[in-house]
Structure formats: structure tokens, C-alpha cells
Amino acid sequence: MPINIPNHLPAKQVLESEHIFVMDESRAFHQDIRPQKIVILNLMPKKIQTETQLLRMLGNSPLQVHFTFLIPSTHTPKNTARQHLDEFYTDFSSIRHKRFDGMIITGAPIEHLPFEDVSYWEELKEIMEWSKTNVTSTLHICWGAQAGLYYHYGIEKVELPKKIFGVFEHTVLKKHERLVRGFDELYYVPHSRHTDINTEQLQSASDLDVLSVSEEAGVCLIVSKDEKQIFLTGHPEYDTDTLLQEYERDIERNLSNVEAPKHYFAPGGKEPVNRWKAHATLLFMNWLNYYVYQETPYEWD
């Protein structure tokens, strides 16, 4: 089954060129199927790129999925055209009365700031509180995971002496959990962050289960006992060249101590090798199937 997206969304042409089944709104309207309703709170600066990456991950589902794109009303994006935001995005006040089957809260390049200093922190707290009653399952990514762990469980983020940057091997700890069903014992995930979560506080949180870890990148995948909150510290949705773009950007900015992403380039070469796409797709499919579709009633009360 296809993903259902607005007719003129830039990601539509890209996904169709990759033979991902995309259905526009007019065609989807005539299908007698209840689509899964997913709201994506997009906090990344390159919004079109993030839209495409996430839709690609969810585009192989046998389910019909309808997406709503959300941005904070208390923050003005600087890297995306106003016309695009006006056409494809909404704000929280427009959806707070609605219920959604799933929600994705993306990362954001603001990890150097205390959470309370983020311009839209109060609004984000309100959205995360709302998600507890109006969303079946919420997937938090990278900074979004750190923000969610801090808000829901009081787990703080900590500064790292050196940026975690590259593609790292992870070990599945609880292989029978539905979120990692079908995973190999070892799998790879891209990471790009200057902060980590406080592992001592995490270990004390009895309502959370850690599903996978990396010797180099730390804890990767965390799920609440009720399966409503999922936290992912890496970026499995990243394209093959996303880390390369970040690396070249940092070099152009003349940032100090810029290191090449680890375990990313082919041996002896300069071309990146994608070793995470299959597991990334499986992760998003497992979330959508087991934590969203199978847990949501056909009609919300």
C-alpha cells in the first residue's frame, strides 16, 4: 500500500523516481481504507530533506499512511521557504483537538543549549504532554529523543568530550521485542551529536527498556514499558551522503577539531558506504506495524 502525501510536496517526485508507491490525496480519498495518521514534528533545518528521508523509510509499508507536518509556532525556520511552510505545514493549535496513530519528533541542531533555553521549549513540552493522550506511539529521534527523555523521565543530556560522528555497530539486547523483530544481532546506525544521555539516570528509570547499544556510540534504542514512547539516539533515516554533507559543512565553517565520520567511507576510498538502510527500513516498519497500526482502534473514541 502507498503513502498518502500532498500532491505538490517536493518529496513526491523523488520518491516516485525510486519506485516507492506514492498516492496523492485525490486518489487516496476514493479508497475505502482507514489510513494510519502520522504527525511529523519537523525540527530539522533542512525540512524538505528530512521530509523525504522519513517518507522514504515509511514508504515500503503495506499500510496506507497519511502525514501531517508540524512546526512550532514559537519558532521561525530560516532554511525553508515560507511558501513551502505555508503550503505543507500546520501548527499545534490546528491539531490539538485531533488524535493521531503515530508521531515522529525529529532531531534539531541545538544540543549545545539547555532545554529551557530553546525558543520553543514550552510549546514542545505542551506537544509532548498532549501526545500522551492523543497519540498511540511517538518516535523521538536524536535531539528529539534527548528532549523526550528529559521531559517524560527527567533524564538529562550530558556534554561529550568529542562529537560522536559516523556509522556505528550496535548490539541488540532484547531480540524478542517487536521493535527489533527481524534484526540481526549486530546492525549499524549513523550518529551525529555532541551530547549523550545520562546513563546512570537511564538505568534508574524502571519504566524504560534499552533495546540496543553500541560500544562507541552508547545507548541507541529505548522503549517505554507501555510502548507509547520510543527514543532513538541515532539517525537511521539519513541518506547515504548526509554525514558527508555535514562533514564538508563543518570543514567550510573552519570549525576546530573536525574529524571524518568513523566507519563511513569505503576502505581506502572517499565514497561513503551505506550499511544501515535495510535495518533502518525494518525499524520504521516494525514501529508502524506493531506499535501504531496494531495498537490503534479503527475509530478513536
UniProtKB/Swiss-Prot annotation:
Bilayer-spanning residue ranges: none
Active site per the UniProt annotation: C142, H235, E237
Pathway: Amino-acid biosynthesis; L-methionine biosynthesis via de novo pathway; O-acetyl-L-homoserine from L-homoserine: step 1/1
GO cellular component: cytoplasm
Catalysed reaction, written as an equation: L-homoserine + acetyl-CoA = O-acetyl-L-homoserine + CoA
Keywords recorded for this protein, A-Z: Acyltransferase, Amino-acid biosynthesis, Cytoplasm, Methionine biosynthesis, Transferase
Sites where the protein binds substrate: K163, S192, R249
EC number(s) per entry: 2.3.1.31
Subcellular location field: Cytoplasm
Database matches in NCBIfam families: metA (TIGR01001)
Function: Transfers an acetyl group from acetyl-CoA to L-homoserine, forming acetyl-L-homoserine.
HAMAP family, per database record: MetA_acyltransf
Protein's name according to its UniProt entry: Homoserine O-acetyltransferase
Species of provenance: Bacillus velezensis (strain DSM 23117 / BGSC 10A6 / LMG 26770 / FZB42)
